[in-house]
């Protein structure tokens, strides 16, 4: 009878979640909130930009293709700060609306770079770490990851690869669909990815501008990621330089600088030292 009552109580009142599970759930909800808020802000921004261009089309000057494609293209070119100049406001009304569009775009871009990009990079790093931890080769794990994080040099490699992929895909598209030669294709792709946007070469077809809507957004995120990692590397170097070195650290640094020992040698010595600490001292 007592066992039945206990079973019924467990069924009616399941065990409460542990603090760790509650914390993980809270963090997960917070991350999803960031992404949802970013999508809402981007949707509101694009809606405002598209409406501005669509309702006041006659008050903009530039090359026309398709109304809605041009509207999205104008919004993304403004948001990404590329600013080709192929579509520009020509009246006081559209200039005021463009000022509002640019101002809100700067605020949202700051949120996108500081919150969303950091969150996406964290997800990417966790996914890569999961793949690395599954490998049986410990040397590969130690070479790529350290203290549960991917080494900064590998993050930079991934960021450079992402930027290179954006440049390459953009150049290929420009050569095939915009009929530019290879030099101009690479030139416009680099100018766009780096958000310089001189305006001497631009997207002029419906297909090109439709591609630019997505490509410029991804390229802006890729460049922001690269800048974040470069800034992180500079901060790390500055922090290390400001730390007061001990005599042993200086000796290890000089040996490593001269090539007499490698990073793997240092790690092996550290492991031996840690194993030595774990061995209990024998009593007398």
Swiss-Prot record:
Q: What intramembrane ranges does the Swiss-Prot or TrEMBL entry report?
A: 70-89, 184-203
Single GO molecular function: potassium channel activity
- How does this chain sit within the bilayer? Multi-pass membrane protein
Q: Which UniProt keywords apply?
A: Cell membrane, Ion channel, Ion transport, Membrane, Potassium, Potassium channel, Potassium transport, Transmembrane, Transmembrane helix, Transport
**Where does it primarily localize?**
membrane
Describe the inactivation phenotype. No effect on pollen germination rate and growth.
Residue ranges annotated as transmembrane are 32-52, 93-113, 157-177, 211-231
Domain comment in the entry = Each of the two pore-forming region (also called P-domain or P-loop) is enclosed by two transmembrane segments (2P/4TM) and contains the GYGD signature motif which seems to be involved in potassium selectivity.
Q: Which family would the database say this protein is a member of? A: Belongs to the two pore domain potassium channel (TC 1.A.1.7) family.
Q: Report the function annotation for this chain.
A: Voltage-independent, instantaneously activating, potassium-selective plasma membrane ion channel. Open rectifier. Regulated by cytoplasmic pH and extra-cellular calcium. Has some permeability for Rb(+) and NH(4)(+), but none for Na(+) or Li(+).
Can you say what this protein is called? Answer: Two-pore potassium channel 4
Q: Which organism is it from?
A: Arabidopsis thaliana (Mouse-ear cress)
